[in-house]
A protein has these predicted regions:
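Extracytoplasmic beta-strand/coil segments of soluble accessory domains associated
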Residues: 37, 62-104
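Short acidic/polar hinge/loop motifs at secondary-structure boundaries
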Residues: 104-132
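Surface-exposed extracellular loop regions of Gram-negative outer-membrane beta-barrel proteins
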Residues: 209, 216, 220-223, 240-267, ...
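N-terminal periplasmic "start-of-domain" segments of outer-membrane beta-barrel proteins
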Residues: 24-56, 81-82
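Conserved C-terminal beta-signal and adjacent last beta-strands/turns
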Residues: 7, 198-207, 214, 240-241, ...
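Gram-negative outer-membrane beta-barrel transporters
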Residues: 164, 381-385, 577, 581-593, ...
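Outer-membrane beta-barrel signature, preferentially recognizing the C-terminal barrel domain
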Residues: 277-280, 285, 291, 319-324, ...
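Periplasmic-side early beta-strands and strand-to-turn transitions of outer-membrane beta-barrels
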Residues: 157-159, 164-279
Length: 839
């Protein structure tokens, strides 16, 4: 309830504003997939203009977003970034949808985006729209975090030819590369980025075209200590080549744009469980977009071919080839009599994966990832200052044959100062990604017979309906000594224990008889074949204890089959301007996540508790000895006394036998191969979490050329355990992997002509990363404590001639090294000189 008290308090405060303000008339299209005013967008949205983009040259376009409120740019290297908005940060994937002119850039199904392997070029970006919050009501399954939409430059408004060359370096040992020694600068000055853009059109602008080409290469910072031991401490030189060309056709009532592009990239990617891998991929895409009146349609095809993928930790090829297609269409309809604007749309997404059995294993022939969906969006003016918006979308996900409806409702209230209050509720549904669904590969060998440990995707669940156990190879011949071994009994036969301790046990009994002079103790030993035969009874078993291989107890429990997770968001936002210079926005949101996915070891080792085996085997042996003595005619009391000696000695040896074998083998799941050991890791669903956060952004325009900005993002809780996800006894954990506090601020001087300058900083507090939501985060490479950091960035540029300019961009001006996650590269300073010439 306390979360809602904060919302109510803020609601009252926002309504109390009574400031002289002006309305923002800028339009955005990414929030609702249709044009709407910025302050009336369905989601909190930020625009990054072409002027801002061109003033800060970057080696990777995602670094342009680092100063934007609510955006978490996870820097993993010089040219390796991941981006997220309000969802938990992942090492590899993102719930943020990235678009270029409406074309999805993510590798659908994997939820993966690599800007260096895309054709995005800073020379060709006209604007960026950052849409924060759930967008599943129009974009479909998986769009729970928001949208980042890049709009490229068309040839009609941006004709001409431009060449841009960037050269720079990095510091690998801290400090400043610009002020470092000549040797240090020489050894690290190895960043190169060459961009080319040409665009033109005919006289009546009915036809236009553009061409973009880019080549870059770079080394990278040193990797973490653990990774360093695996790959020799330094990552290889990486490169990327991108090319795309677009044709634009304009008629009286239509326009058609076709784009073809290709990319060839070698770099480093990281997976949250299996560390670094060298990634080589060649991609090509074709896109056609048609607009006619209120109707639009778009088709996109992408093919990704991996040519050299090698996971350093696993020591194996880990490439995932794919063919991806996306067809979308939409229609906009105005109903003036009802003061309503309607927007309809439908999508069909299909991606086919091919790993050659190396990553998706047994799922290789059933890993097609398809969703089909349709949406409607309706915006109605109820009163002069009140609008309502409803969006709803239904999607069907073929992998688990499940459908889901994602609704969204928004109320807009415009006050008498020109500000807009936005109150919204939305629900999104997220499928597991293909890596979670289909993974089936070896991460560690368990012997020479092909046995291995590795993940198993949750498209199907692992079960133990008919469990058996499989002994380790060195014990197989020993287990086979039983005439009818019962591997369906999860326990050790006392027959095997008897064979295991027979020689030292018999010797001890003989020594005891000789030492005590009680020769009656020899009788069962002299009839040892009768003792062994009695152990063959099916009841003479001691149950195994199950553990994880390190001695930690485990239950015999299968894994869960994939289910859609649900995320419900309540949001209150207010934006306004004070006078002509100061603008601000405040967004407070509450997010409830249900059906969280975690990962755990499913296959247990089998072992024997020494105390239990000692007691049960000793008792069994005593009963056998007692029977032999009674059959020989000894009185009951004498037989019992002698049998107790057998119980004590036999129990002691049995306990030692159990203690000497920490693992006898593995329990076989119903899905386990018969001929090898397979230690499975897989997924399970648990609980729900609830947290709230806020994004506050301010901007002050000193004059037409200079401005100051500051923003703050806050989340009240980022680590969830015990009663946060279930009850006080729950072992489950969930981490957002986002710091609670993030502050960004800066000064920008960017006149239409002459010198431009920018100085900014980014602060975030410390956090504990747990990328797999595992109860033991020490098992995984990138988990652990991440210290707080403050990073200063600077850019300066000036014209040399009317057509040529030079820029310097310095990331991490102070050169204080930091890591995004444990065992990732230590990020130092990066300096980049850029020369741009317009023909």
């Amino acid at each position: 309830m306390k979360n809602y008290n904060y919302l109510i308090l803020l609601f009252v405060l926002l309504l109390s504003f009574n400031l002289t303000a002006q309305q923002n008339s800028e339009e955005v299209t990414a929030a609702s997939r249709t044009a709407e005013k910025l302050n009336e967008a369905s989601n909190s949205t930020t625009i990054i203009s072409e002027k801002e983009i061109s003033s800060k040259k970057s080696f990777n376009v995602l670094s342009l977003l680092e100063g934007t409120v609510g955006v978490n740019v996870s820097r993993q290297g010089v040219n390796s970034f991941n981006v997220s908005l309000r969802e938990g940060v992942d090492v590899f994937s993102t719930r943020t949808v990235l678009l270029s002119d409406g074309r999805e850039l993510n590798t659908y199904g994997l939820n993966f985006f690599d800007a260096s392997a895309s054709t995005l070029s800073g020379l060709d970006i006209a604007r960026v729209e950052v849409v924060r919050g759930s967008s599943s009501a129009v974009y479909g399954l998986g769009a729970s975090s928001g949208v980042i939409s890049f709009t490229t430059k068309n040839p009609f408004d941006y004709a001409g030819t431009t060449i841009q060359v960037s050269s720079g370096g990095i510091t690998k040992f801290g400090g400043s590369i610009l002020a470092g020694s000549a040797k240090n600068v020489q050894s690290n000055w190895n960043l190169l980025d060459v961009n080319f853009r040409h665009a033109d059109h005919n006289e009546d602008k009915s036809f236009g075209y553009k061409i973009n080409a880019r080549y870059s290469e770079n080394s990278d910072w040193l990797v973490g200590d653990q990774t360093s031991q695996t790959i020799g401490g330094e990552l290889p030189v990486m490169h990327s080549f991108n090319f795309d060309t677009s044709l634009y056709f304009k008629g009286e009532d239509y326009d058609v744009t076709t784009t073809f592009g290709l990319n060839d990239t070698e770099n480093i990617s990281r997976r949250k469980m299996w560390g670094e891998e060298k990634r080589g991929v060649s991609s090509k895409f074709f896109n056609v977009k048609v607009n006619s009146g209120n109707f639009h349609a778009q088709y996109n095809y992408v093919q990704n071919d991996t040519k050299e993928n090698y996971n350093y930790w696993i020591g194996a090829d880990h490439g995932i080839d794919s063919q991806q297609s996306h067809f979308q269409l939409g229609y906009e309809l105005s109903l003036p009599s009802l003061s309503t604007e309607l927007n309809f749309g439908a999508d069909n997404r299909l991606i086919k994966f091919d790993t050659g059995g190396k990553v998706f294993g047994s799922y290789e022939d059933e890993d097609d990832f398809r969703t089909v969906g349709a949406f409607v969006s309706s915006k109605t003016k109820l009163f002069d200052n009140v609008d309502v918006l409803f969006q709803g979308r239904y999607d069907h996900f073929n992998v688990i044959n499940e459908g889901a409806f994602s609704p969204k409702g928004v109320i807009f209230v415009k006050d008498n100062t020109g500000g807009t209050l936005r109150l919204s509720m939305s629900q999104s549904n997220n499928p597991d990604d293909a890596y979670t669904l289909f993974s089936d590969f070896s991460t560690q060998s368990l012997g020479s017979n092909g046995s291995y440990m590795g993940p198993y995707g949750n498209k199907r669940g692992l079960t133990f309906n008919n469990p058996t156990w499989k002994p380790w190879p060195n014990l197989e011949s020993f287990v086979a000594l039983h005439p009818t071994p019962r591997l369906d009994i999860l326990g050790i036969s006392h027959f095997h224990v008897m064979l295991g301790v027979l020689q030292p046990f018999a010797q001890t009994m003989i020594q005891t008889a000789m030492a005590t002079g009680n020769m009656l103790l020899l009788y069962p030993v002299q009839n040892i074949e009768l003792v062994i035969a009695s152990m063959l009874s099916g009841a003479n078993y001691t149950d195994f204890i199950l553990h994880d291989g390190l001695g930690n107890p485990m239950d015999l429990k299968g894994s869960d089959t994939s289910q859609l997770s649900t995320e419900t968001t309540y949001e209150l936002g207010y934006s306004n301007t004070i006078g002509d210079k100061f603008s601000y926005s405040v967004d407070v949101y509450n997010i409830q996540k249900n059906n969280i996915v975690g990962m755990r070891q499913v296959t247990p080792h089998v072992a024997i508790d020494p105390a239990t085996l000692g007691a049960e085997f000793g008792n069994n042996l005593a009963n056998t000895a007692y029977g032999l003595y009674r059959n020989a005619g000894l009185p009951a009391a004498t037989a019992a006394a002698l049998a107790n000696v057998y119980a004590a000695v036999g129990g002691q040896f049995a306990a030692g036998f159990a203690a000497g074998i920490p693992s006898l083998g593995l329990v076989q799941a119903d899905q386990s191969p018969n001929d090898i050991h397979r230690l499975y890791w897989s997924h399970y669903n648990f609980g729900e979490i609830n947290y709230w956060g806020a994004d506050i952004a301010t901007n002050y325009e000193i004059n037409s050329a200079a401005s100051l900005y500051a923003n703050y993002s806050f989340i009240n809780q980022t680590e969830f355990t015990r009663e946060d996800v279930g009850d006080i006894t729950s072992p489950d954990v969930y981490h957002l992997n986002i710091p609670k506090h993030r502050v960004k601020a800066g000064f920008v001087y960017n006149p239409d002509k002459g010198l431009n300058f920018g100085l900014s900083f980014r602060y975030q507090n410390s956090m504990n990363a747990n990328t797999l939501n595992s109860g033991d985060s020490s098992l995984f490479w990138f988990d652990g404590f991440v210290p707080k950091r403050t990073v200063w960035d600077m850019n300066v540029g000036m014209p040399i001639t009317s057509k040529t300019r030079i820029d310097l961009t310095v990331d991490n001006v102070l050169g204080k090294k930091y890591q995004t996650f444990v065992n990732m590269p230590m990020i130092g300073q990066q300096a980049l000189f850029t020369l741009t010439h317009n023909f």
